[in-house]
């Protein structure tokens, strides 16, 4: 099992995997949901630029997208924001991930977060924080298994840091 960074050459298999993830799910946004394949190809180019901190719209930060691949099969998506903003501190942190519906409940969420944490450290991201909707017990468990420490909460979210 491995993480593969998004490439402008990614094709149909990645597109189909992303179609197995809802548009918004547990606060994870899948912008590819509802896109045509041609739109997906254009989105890849934009995301590749963002990973290089180029052409980022105001109010956004650079992010790098990775695919979780198991035996050449795309399983899930992970996003690493290069830095935290006030908005992302409250609403998402700097790592987000989702597993395609047909692969859930098999430990892939735990694995993708483990690999994303290593990648974030390799990228020299100093502060790693995740937020979780309070009803999303599966993601809470994944974060705790990977060493996340609860440091705050409110009526809607749990806030975790990795030290």
Q: Where do the protein language model's features map onto the residues?
A:
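Conserved beta-strand-loop-alpha-helix junction that forms the acyl-donor binding cleft
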Residues: 130-138
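Conserved GNAT acetyl-CoA-binding A-motif
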Residues: 121-131
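Extended, folded domain segments that form the structural surfaces/walls around functional sites
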Residues: 20, 81, 106-123, 155-156, ...
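Conserved acetyl-CoA-binding loop-helix of GNAT-fold acetyltransferases
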Residues: 96-99, 105-118, 140-145
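Short aromatic/hydrophobic contact patches that present stacked aromatics
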Residues: 2, 96, 129-131
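Conserved catalytic-core motifs of GNAT/GCN5-like acyltransferases
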Residues: 131, 144-162
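Short coil/turn motifs at secondary-structure junctions
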Residues: 83-85, 102, 135
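GNAT-family acyltransferases
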Residues: 1-94, 155-163
């Amino acid at each position: 099992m491995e993480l593969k960074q998004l490439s402008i050459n990614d094709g149909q298999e990645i597109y189909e995997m992303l179609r197995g993830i809802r548009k918004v799910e547990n606060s994870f946004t899948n912008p590819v949901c509802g896109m045509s394949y041609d739109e997906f190809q254009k989105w890849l180019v934009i995301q590749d630029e963002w990973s290089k901190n180029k052409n980022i719209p105001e109010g956004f930060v650079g992010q790098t997208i990775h695919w979780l691949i198991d035996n050449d099969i795309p399983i899930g998506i992970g996003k690493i924001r290069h830095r935290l903003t006030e908005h992302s501190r409250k609403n998402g942190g700097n790592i987000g991930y989702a597993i395609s519906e047909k692969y859930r409940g098999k430990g892939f969420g735990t694995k993708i977060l483990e690999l994303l944490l290593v990648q974030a450290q390799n990228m020299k991201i100093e502060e790693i924080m995740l937020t979780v909707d309070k009803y999303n017990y599966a993601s809470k468990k994944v974060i705790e298994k990977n060493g996340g420490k609860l440091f705050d909460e409110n009526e809607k979210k749990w806030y975790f840091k990795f030290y």
